[in-house]
UniProtKB/Swiss-Prot annotation:
Originating species: Brucella canis (strain ATCC 23365 / NCTC 10854 / RM-666)
Name of this protein: Small ribosomal subunit protein uS5
Keyword terms, alphabetized: Ribonucleoprotein, Ribosomal protein, RNA-binding, rRNA-binding
Similarity annotation: Belongs to the universal ribosomal protein uS5 family.
UniProt domain comment: The N-terminal domain interacts with the head of the 30S subunit; the C-terminal domain interacts with the body and contacts protein S4. The interaction surface between S4 and S5 is involved in control of translational fidelity.
Amino acid sequence: MAQRERNREERGREERDSEFVDKLVHINRVAKVVKGGRRFGFAALVVVGDQKGRVGFGHGKAREVPEAIRKATEAAKRDMIFVPLRSGRTLHHDVEGRHGAGKVLLRAAPAGKGIIAGGPMRAVFETLGVQDVVAKSLGSSNPYNMVRATFDALKHQMHPKDIAAQRGIKYSTLQARRHDVVGSEE
């Protein structure tokens, strides 16, 4: 009886996990120096998302690569954030993020533009569900700093309704202003 319940729980966990897409961003061989020499292990950086606006990243370390990836994936699923997307495909506004010496600039893009971003940032956008974005990384090219800077930028992403509420104006007024500005640029 207990075995059946355990199997049911595992199936439920697998169904929940199947909704997520995970991408391995970086794997690194690390060494711990001990009295007898060096002990080698692996560190993995993984990004996990549901391609509907939820995304997280995790770091895992272990003696074997698959175990490091599993730990990183579990850490990423525990620490996810929600990012509001415009039309489910791009960002609402341009934003900048920083972490350490890494700095990233994220710009909303028109439909059909695609994901124009370098390595670690591309993995974040693909798992997030963004289809059109232009991103530029400045400073550090360390994958850990780039991913953390990207998450810093995404945390500052706000829905226009929230911006309108902060400013004390109607959402429709904000949208009208946005269309006036976008229309004058073309």
